[in-house]
A protein has these predicted regions:
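Bacterial N-terminal signal peptides
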Residues: 3-15
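Acidic, polar ligand-binding/catalytic clefts
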Residues: 67, 71, 78-146, 216-217, ...
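Bilobed "Venus flytrap"/periplasmic-binding protein-like clamshell domains
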Residues: 39-48, 58-75, 111, 129-183, ...
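Periplasmic-binding protein-like
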Residues: 44, 126-138, 184, 202, ...
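Ligand-binding clefts/hinges and TM-proximal coupling segments of bilobed small-molecule sensing domains
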Residues: 20-23, 159-178, 213, 217-218, ...
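Extended ligand-binding regions for polar small-molecule ligands
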Residues: 20-23, 29, 60-72, 138-140, ...
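A ligand-binding cleft/hinge motif common to bilobed small-molecule-binding domains
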Residues: 92-93, 107-119, 163-170, 188-224
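Extracytoplasmic small-molecule ligand-binding "clamshell" domains
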Residues: 21-106
Length: 286
């Protein structure tokens, strides 16, 4: 029995060593494997995707997805454990934190764009969103076309800001687009009347902390398509492959359905056909 146990132990140790020796020397997987720790950048204010729970722990849809991915990476590297070290970031610092090496990946509500690919790489898509606008119910604003002469707040440097500017030009809506630093400033402008609307991803708008949510409503317009992904360091194909392998497993085995239901059943959101296709495309074969 002892001989069998020793043989099995030697086999698994050899398999783990083999998995780690195949990692390119310049990949962050080397550091991750050596430290048995992976650093994940996450925002505290992007509910329901990435935010702080009651005990100040990192929670959300994207956080749960990344926890499952980390479990897969642990298995791929043959590690007995792989701890997560959370790195707090803002909407402005999330990509530079990954690019500079302060974090190995970023999990939240980050939209993939060609411009952002100049700074970071991205995983397979993990969600699809759209840009929306929240306005006061007391206003006469019933659609985006009614925003002429109004002020629309959007976080500076986001795809929402770009989308609103493009839609204003496309539909000849002569509104003032006001840049804010974060969601808190956008909400403050909306509640004080300094802005007539606040633009962001629709589910982020649903998760806003408004003093009196009943006073506000979301316009029906869907003003852009926002494909979310995990941000990764540029050029690190081994880490990107490990992450995409984890995502493929989650999608193939159906674990993503449970994560989706956990976060979106409570607000009555059903999985759209487009999102089902997105998961299907990410369920790559080994």
């Amino acid at each position: 029995m002892l001989r069998i146990f020793a043989s099995l132990l030697a086999f698994f140790l050899a398999a783990a060593a083999s998995a780690q020796t195949q990692i390119p020397p310049d990949s962050r997987l080397k550091t991750i494997a050596a430290a048995k720790t992976i650093k994940i950048a996450a925002r505290p204010d992007a509910a329901p995707f990435s935010f702080l729970g009651p005990a100040k722990e990192q929670v959300g849809y994207s956080i749960d997805v990344c926890r499952l991915v980390v479990g897969s990476i642990q298995q791929q590297l043959g590690l007995d454990q792989l701890k997560i070290e959370w790195v707090p970031v803002t909407v402005d610092s999330r990509f530079s934190t990954v690019a500079s090496g302060k974090a190995d990946m970023e999990c939240g509500s980050s939209t993939v764009t060609l411009g952002r690919m100049k700074e970071v790489d991205f995983s397979s898509f993990i969600f699809l969103e759209t840009t929306g606008v929240v306005v006061s119910r007391a206003s006469n604003i019933r659609g985006f076309a009614d925003m002429t002469g109004k002020k629309i707040a959007a976080i500076s440097g986001t795809t929402n800001q770009t989308a609103i500017a493009a839609q204003m030009k496309l539909h000849k809506v002569e509104a003032a687009l006001v840049a804010v630093k974060d969601a808190g400033e956008g909400v403050a402008m909306l509640e004080s009347g300094k802005a007539d609307g606040y633009a962001s991803d629709k589910l982020l708008l649903i998760g806003l902390h408004l003093k009196d949510p009943a006073q506000f409503t979301m316009l029906p317009d869907e003003l852009s398509v926002e494909p979310y992904a995990i941000a990764l360091p540029r050029g690190d194909w081994a880490l990107r492959l490990a992450v995409n392998t984890g995502l493929a497993q989650i999608y193939r085995h159906g674990e993503i359905v449970g994560v989706f239901k956990k976060w979106f059943d409570q607000i009555g959101l059903q999985m759209s056909p487009a999102l089902r296709i997105t998961y299907g495309l990410g369920a790559l074969a080994d």
